[in-house]
C-alpha cells in the first residue's frame, strides 16, 4: 500500500512525460567498513533510481531503504550530482574514489529536501522516498542531463562531521545516470578535463571555491 501511494502520487508526472530511467540494486546489510554510526535499516540503501522526463526538464530520484525511515533516529541522505565537471572526489580513503560530484541534494528523514537554497518536492512513505528535481537547478557544466551522474549516501547524525558517518553508497563506487551506470573516465580523460577546466579557472575560481566549501559542509 505504501508503495502504491508513492506510485499514484507521481503518476501524473510519469504519464504526461515518458521518461528514461535506470535503477541500481544494492545488497541488504552492506554497511561500509569505515562506518562507525548506528547501523539502522533506514541507513541501508537497497535500490536507487534516476528518471528524466522526455522534455529533459525534471529528474525524479528515488531510494528504497532496508527498513522504514524513522525520523526519531539520527540520520539524513545525501545525493551527489555530477553535471559534467564533478571533480570533488572526497571518498577515496574509504574505497569510493569514483563517487564524484559538483552539486549536492540533502534529504531529511522528515521528508524535506534541499538543493542549495532551493526546497525540493519530496514524497516519503515507509522505506522509500522520491525527490523531484528541476533540471534548471542543475545547470550543465560539460554534459547533457541524460548523462548526469548521481550517487546516494546516507549519513548518521544530524550534521556532517566526517566520512565515518557514511553508512552506504548506491551505486558502490560509481555514478548512476538516467541510462544506467556511467563509465569511469580513463586517467588521460581526467587529465584533459582538468586541463580544460584550468584554462577557464581564473575566471570562475572564486565562485568554484565557494561552491566547494559549501558542498564540503553538507556532503
Where do the protein language model's features map onto the residues?
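C-terminal membrane-anchoring or membrane-association module
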Residues: 201-219
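Structured beta-strand segments within beta-sheet-rich domains
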Residues: 100-139
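Short, threonine-centered small-residue motifs that mark membrane-proximal processing/anchoring sites
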Residues: 4-23, 177-199
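A mature extracytoplasmic/lumenal domain signature
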Residues: 65, 135-137, 195
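Order/disorder boundary and secretion-linked terminal/linker segments
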Residues: 20-76, 80-112, 156-182
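Extracellular structured ligand-interaction cores
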Residues: 56-58, 74-76, 117-121, 126-130, ...
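Ser/Thr/Pro-rich, low-complexity mucin-like regions
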Residues: 126-169
Amino acid at each position: 500500500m505504501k508503495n502504491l501511494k508513492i506510485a499514484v502520487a507521481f503518476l501524473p508526472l510519469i504519464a504526461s512525460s515518458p521518461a528514461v530511467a535506470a535503477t541500481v540494486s544494492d545488497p541488504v546489510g552492506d554497511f561500509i567498513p569505515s562506518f562507525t554510526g548506528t547501523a539502522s535499516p533506514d541507513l541501508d540503501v537497497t535500490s536507487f533510481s534516476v528518471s528524466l522526463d522526455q522534455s529533459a526538464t525534471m529528474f525524479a530520484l528515488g531510494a528504497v531503504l532496508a527498513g522504514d525511515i524513522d525520523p526519531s533516529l539520527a540520520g539524513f541522505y545525501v545525493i551527489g550530482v555530477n553535471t559534467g565537471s564533478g571533480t570533488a572526489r572526497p571518498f577515496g580513503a574509504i574505497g569510493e574514489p569514483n563517487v564524484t560530484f559538483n552539486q549536492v541534494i540533502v534529504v531529511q528523514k522528515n521528508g524535506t529536501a534541499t538543493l542549495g537554497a532551493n526546497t525540493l518536492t519530496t514524497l516519503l512513505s515507509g522505506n522509500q522516498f522520491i525527490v523531484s528535481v528541476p533540471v534548471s537547478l542543475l545547470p550543465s557544466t560539460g554534459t547533457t542531463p541524460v548523462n548526469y551522474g548521481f550517487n546516494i549516501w546516507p549519513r548518521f547524525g544530524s550534521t556532517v562531521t566526517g566520512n565515518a558517518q557514511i553508512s552506504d553508497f548506491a551505486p558502490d563506487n560509481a555514478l548512476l545516470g538516467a541510462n544506467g551506470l556511467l563509465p569511469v573516465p580513463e586517467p588521460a580523460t581526467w587529465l584533459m578535463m582538468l586541463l580544460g577546466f584550468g584554462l577557464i579557472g581564473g575566471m570562475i575560481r572564486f565562485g568554484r571555491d565557494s561552491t566547494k566549501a559549501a558542498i564540503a559542509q553538507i556532503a
